[in-house]
Each structure stands twice: as structure tokens, then as C-alpha cells.
Design a protein with these regions (language model features):
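Active-site acidic carboxylates
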Residues: 2-94, 154, 160-167, 172-175
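Cofactor-binding loop segments of dinucleotide-utilizing enzymes, especially the Rossmann-like FAD-
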Residues: 14, 54, 122-124, 149
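Histidine-anchored nucleotide/phosphate-binding helix
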Residues: 39-41, 129-139
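A short helix->loop->beta-strand "cap" motif at the edges of active sites that frequently abuts
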Residues: 45-47, 139-143
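Short, conserved acidic/polar surface loops in the N-terminal third of protein domains
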Residues: 60-64, 105-107, 130
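Internal catalytic-core helix/loop-beta-alpha segment
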Residues: 77-126
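Conserved strand-to-helix beginnings and helix N-cap segments that scaffold or border functional pockets
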Residues: 106, 129-132, 156-160
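A short glycine-rich beta-strand->turn/loop micro-motif centered on a GG-aromatic cluster
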Residues: 118-122, 142-156, 176
Length: 176
């Protein structure tokens, strides 16, 4: 019992940015999870919440990602780059990243002696799965869960495939 009081559990909000919700790469599925994400954020204190923020610059279209996905999105300083206004509830830390996964986030979780991490956000099949697997690699004893009801993928099919991939890598998928 006393151990459970000392456990450190964090929530990580992945790339919950305007461009992925109703902007250049937005989807109706992303818009549909907004209320659930806001509800989930409210169950954690500010010092228990982390976030990632996809961050690109003017040279995006010259990058490998930009050549494979030639849609300008999440350019730093633009409205599309901002975390959705209802999700701006305060975070212990926000990790800006210009790649799918944040090594800095994974190192932070390892170095902070975290016991459990819950991930929510966008896109299940790109940045959520990338960050879940990075955390699993950097901190293999941390219990990782992903709330499927607070995530969405590029397509419903790729969302499902990513959830199955994470399950096979010993990541607990809840509300599936």
C-alpha cells in the first residue's frame, strides 16, 4: 500500500496540435476525440502531465519526412503548431520534436524514475507508437499504457494496426 503512494505516474499528450485536429492534416476522427482527451487531462495534475509538440520549420519540404508527406504542417509559431486550446491545461514539460519520436522524452522518463506512463494523442500509427516504443527501449521496466479512446490514427485501419503492434511489444492498450 505505501509503495503505491510513492509511485510516479505520468501522462504524455502526443502532438495534440491544431494542424492534426482541424488543420492541414486534420481528420473527423481527431476532432471526435477532443472531449475524451480533455477529460483525461483533467485526471492528472499539472506536474504529472508532459506533452510533445511536432515542430517543423521553413525547410520542411526538403526533409525526408517532407518529401514523403509533402503537406506543410506544425510550422513553429503558426496557429497550426499550437496545442489545441482546450488542451492547454499546463504541463510539467513540453518536448518539441521534428521527428516522429522524442529521444529527449524517453531519456527524461528513464532519468526521472517514473513507474508508469500513459500515452494519448495523435497519430496512433506514427508518433504515438514511435514514442511508446522509444520509452519501452529507454526505460524497459516502466509500465506503459496507451488509451485507445484518446488516440486516433491517419486512418481507422492504421490506428488499429498500431494498437496491435504496441500490444505485441508489451504495451498495455486500454479502452480498446
Amino acid at each position: 500500500m505505501w509503495y503505491s503512494l510513492l509511485m510516479k505516474k505520468l501522462l504524455v499528450l502526443i502532438d495534440f496540435q491544431n494542424d492534426f485536429i482541424d488543420g492541414s492534416l486534420g481528420t473527423k476522427e481527431a476532432q471526435a476525440i477532443v472531449p475524451k482527451v480533455i477529460e483525461k487531462l483533467a485526471t492528472y495534475a499539472e506536474n504529472e502531465r508532459l506533452a510533445t509538440q511536432d515542430t517543423h520549420f521553413e525547410d520542411y519540404l526538403t526533409t525526408q519526412e517532407g518529401q514523403n508527406l509533402p503537406v506543410i504542417h506544425c510550422q513553429k509559431g503558426t496557429p497550426g503548431w499550437e496545442i489545441h486550446k482546450e488542451a492547454q491545461v499546463g504541463f510539467q514539460r513540453v518536448f518539441e520534436k521534428n521527428i516522429f519520436g522524442s529521444v529527449e522524452l524517453a531519456e527524461y522518463i528513464r532519468n526521472e524514475n517514473v513507474d508508469q506512463v500513459e500515452l494519448i494523442g495523435i497519430c496512433t500509427d506514427i508518433c504515438v507508437v514511435s514514442n511508446a516504443l522509444l520509452i519501452k527501449s529507454f526505460a524497459p521496466e516502466v509500465k506503459i499504457s496507451v488509451d485507445a479512446s484518446c488516440c486516433t490514427g491517419v486512418t481507422p485501419e492504421s490506428h488499429r494496426a498500431a494498437l496491435e503492434t504496441m500490444k505485441s511489444c508489451q504495451i498495455n492498450v486500454i479502452n480498446d
